Amino acid sequence: MDSADRRIAEAAASIRDHLKAQPEAAETAEGIAHWWVLPVTGEKDLEVVMEALALLEQRGEVEPWQLGRRFLYRAGPALRGG
């Protein structure tokens, strides 16, 4: 696993762990980067967080949810047990 893949995997794990602990949480990609990922991994690159969200979305662990003009991300069916 190269450095970029490792950073994405670490960001994805931080997001997954947060949603397991707070299953009703929903946040923008920017908020996820700042509040959920940065404190755990030190990752500051929004592109890495976006890649992690895309990976988790493919797995059904997160889903985008449009609220007005913004997209929030929340736990997907794989984390909600459905």
Regions found by a protein language model. Name each.
Residues 57-67:
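A short, conserved structural fragment
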Residues 25-37:
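Short acidic, hydrophobic short linear motifs in intrinsically disordered regions
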Residues 1-26:
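Short alpha-helical segments that sit at the start of domains
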Residues 37-50:
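Short, positively charged loop/turn segments that connect secondary-structure elements
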Residues 66-82:
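Short, cationic-aromatic polyanion-contact patches
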Residues 32, 49-59:
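Basic amphipathic alpha-helical segments that dock to polyanions
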